[in-house]
């Protein structure tokens, strides 16, 4: 039978069947998944412990590897430390490459130590670090000792020869990266202190043996003058300034700071200041001590000036200030500027104690005093410094006043130089003051002699004649002697002494230059003053002519006027007169008679003088001729051939030619 099946029903049936199959399939899958899940859980519980072990093993492996790496680094650094230790334990002298190589190794050691200390992983190796640090400290101490050996007690040449090593050591310690690992020093400040201390000590030791020679020697005889250079102050100053200059050269050669020179020389200059101060505080306290030691005082000052100039030349002005030298210098000037007053006062005192004045003892005193002045003048720079605060003539002020001051001064008015604007005023004024002082000294000597000679009486005081056979003949002996009470004799002694004094000046380069043209002019004023005294006899003879001729001429003129005569008789001028009155004839006779007596006495006295110097004799001879020749010629021209007498030869002993010839022969 055929069944008619509905199509939709067929589809539903098919779908149901498929659903049933799908359900079965899903159930089967679910079971399988459950099995898988169960098995996975079982596997997981089994694998987890294994994974933990694997991870632990991996961690352990990394730790082992890191440990091995650390050990390797430590081993490498330990090897480096060992190598450096071997190098640093060597002496610097035996180190290959010397100090340069040693400092390189030391610098490397410091860098390595610094590098290791910054890494925390090395902190556990404290023993290595401690030993390495001690090694570096010992090595730096070794460098410092080597450095001290280089600079201690060595002269400049030895230091300069080692300048490269000194520079390297300074560079090492001045490098911030090489700062000392210890607290005991080793930086730039420390090595600088070592250098300053070593060089300062050497300088002091160099000077110490000379210091005792700077003390003024005790004189066995107070009259023996101090000899320039016998005191050790010049040597001391030369050594000090020379060594300071060498220390500066060393600093420059070693490329060290020149500012170190101050601390190096400070104590030595301080000792020098002490020596200088001691002169015035201990040795030259009284005026007499100052006068007795004036050459030494000036020698010391000359050295102070030289020292000051030398240090300024090498740029150490600041050192001079800081060492208190400038104060010492100025104090020395202030204290010893009294030498000008004391020197002239000593001259005045010397003549007051001379007793009777004569040719010989005055010459002796002049030689004595001018020798002192000549030696004084050799210290021109010192004198210019000492005199700079004086005003003209201030050294002559004293209480009571010195004797010669109120008698005569050769000072030339308005001779002081004018101020200028070229910066040389002080120097010019100082030169003028020094020249004036020297001239005042000469005034003091010569005017004191003049005062002393004028105080002498004729009794027993006489002048030896030129016929004296012995230079040592006493000035008061001899029958053919002249009274020292005569002006002409006093004038002769004064001029002769002045000539001798002038010859001493001319032989002294410094004294002659300092006196200059102004000093020469002042000596000339003294010479003219004394020449007037010397020419007193000749002036009297000349005066007789001038006086009597004037009298005769005046009376004749009056007579002519009253008698209204022609002017064939004239006064003191014109040609030969005639028609003389009896009175005039007698007056002319007396004139010739008085002149002849005065002239012959002057000539007689002149021939008794002991000139001893041809230049002096020629000078005086010329001055006499200038005074007497023209005067006599006027007399002869007026009355020599007149009719005043029949016995002409009795009165007119010389014509003009014979008169001049006589003077040339006898003067």
UniProtKB/Swiss-Prot annotation:
One of its GO terms (molecular function) is phosphatidylinositol-4,5-bisphosphate binding. Pfam families: Exo70_C, Exo70_N. One of its GO terms (cellular component) is exocyst. Keywords: Exocytosis, Protein transport, Transport. One of its GO terms (biological process) is protein transport. Residues 460-483, 557-579 are annotated as: Disordered. Residues 557-570 have a biased composition (Low complexity). It is found in: Bud; Bud neck. It comes from the Eukaryota. The keyword Transport applies. Its main location: other. Belongs to the EXO70 family. Involved in the secretory pathway as part of the exocyst complex which tethers secretory vesicles to the sites of exocytosis. Also plays a role in the assembly of the exocyst. This is Exocyst complex protein EXO70. The gene is EXO70.
């Amino acid at each position: 039978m055929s069944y008619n099946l509905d199509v939709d029903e067929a589809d539903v049936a098919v779908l149901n069947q498929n659903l049933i199959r799908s359900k079965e399939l899903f159930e089967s899958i679910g079971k399988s998944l459950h099995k898988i899940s169960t098995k996975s859980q079982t596997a997981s519980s089994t694998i987890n412990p294994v994974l933990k072990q694997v991870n632990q093993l991996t961690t352990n492996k990394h730790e082992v590897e890191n440990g091995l790496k650390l050990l390797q680094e430590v081993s490498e650094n330990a090897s480096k430390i060992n190598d450096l230790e071997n190098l640093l334990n060597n002496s610097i002298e035996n180190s290959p490459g010397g100090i340069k190589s040693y400092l390189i190794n030391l610098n490397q050691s410091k860098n390595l130590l610094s590098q290791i200390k910054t890494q925390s992983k090395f902190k556990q190796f404290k023993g290595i670090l401690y030993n390495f640090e001690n090694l570096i400290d010992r090595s730096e101490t070794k460098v410092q000792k080597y450095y001290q050996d280089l600079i201690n007690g060595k002269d400049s040449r030895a230091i300069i020869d080692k300048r490269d090593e000194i520079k390297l050591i300074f560079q090492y310690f001045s490098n911030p990266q090489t700062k000392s690992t210890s607290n005991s020093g080793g930086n730039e400040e420390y090595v600088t202190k070592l250098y300053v201390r070593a060089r300062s000590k050497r300088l002091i030791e160099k000077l110490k043996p000379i210091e005792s020679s700077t003390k003024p020697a005790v004189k066995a005889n107070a009259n023996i003058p101090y000899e320039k250079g016998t005191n050790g102050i010049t040597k001391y100053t030369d050594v000090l300034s020379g060594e300071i200059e060498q220390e500066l050269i060393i600093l420059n050669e070693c490329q060290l700071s020149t500012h170190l020179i101050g601390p190096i020389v400070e104590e030595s200059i301080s000792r020098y200041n002490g020596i200088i101060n001691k002169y015035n505080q201990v040795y030259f306290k009284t005026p007499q001590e100052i006068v007795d030691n004036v050459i030494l005082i000036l020698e010391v000052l000359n050295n102070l000036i030289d020292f000051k100039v030398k240090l300024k030349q090498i740029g150490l002005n600041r050192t001079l200030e800081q060492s208190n030298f400038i104060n010492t210098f100025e104090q020395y000037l202030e204290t010893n500027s009294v030498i000008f007053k004391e020197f002239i006062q000593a001259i005045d005192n010397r003549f007051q104690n001379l007793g009777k004045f004569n040719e010989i003892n005055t010459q002796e005193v002049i030689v004595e005093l001018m020798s002192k002045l000549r030696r004084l003048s050799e210290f021109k720079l010192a004198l210019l410094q000492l005199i700079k605060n004086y005003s003209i003539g201030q050294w002559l002020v004293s209480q009571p006043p010195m004797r010669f001051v109120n008698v005569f001064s050769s000072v030339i008015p308005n001779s002081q130089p004018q101020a200028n604007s070229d910066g040389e005023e002080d120097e010019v004024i100082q030169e003028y003051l020094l020249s004036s002082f020297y001239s005042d000294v000469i005034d003091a000597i010569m005017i004191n002699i003049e005062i002393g000679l004028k105080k002498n009486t004729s009794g027993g005081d006489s002048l030896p004649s030129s016929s004296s056979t012995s230079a040592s003949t006493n000035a008061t002996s001899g029958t053919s002697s002249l009274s020292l009470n005569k002006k002409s004799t006093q004038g002769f002694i004064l001029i002769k002494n002045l000539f001798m004094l002038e010859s001493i000046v001319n032989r002294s380069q410094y004294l002659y230059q300092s006196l200059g043209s102004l000093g020469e002019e002042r000596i000339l004023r003294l010479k003219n003053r004394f020449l007037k005294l010397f020419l007193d006899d000749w002036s009297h003879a000349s005066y007789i002519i001038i006086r009597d001729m004037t009298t005769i001429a005046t009376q004749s003129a009056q007579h002519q006027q009253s008698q209204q005569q022609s002017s064939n008789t004239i006064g003191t001028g014109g040609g030969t007169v005639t028609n003389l009155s009896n009175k005039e004839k007698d007056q002319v006779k007396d004139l010739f008679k008085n002149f002849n007596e005065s002239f012959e006495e002057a000539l007689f006295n002149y021939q008794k003088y002991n000139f001893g110097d041809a230049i002096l004799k020629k000078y005086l001879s010329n001055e006499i001729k200038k005074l007497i020749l023209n005067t006599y010629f006027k007399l002869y021209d007026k009355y020599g051939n007149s009719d005043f007498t029949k016995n002409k030869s009795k009165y007119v002993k010389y014509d003009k030619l014979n008169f001049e010839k006589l003077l040339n022969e006898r003067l």
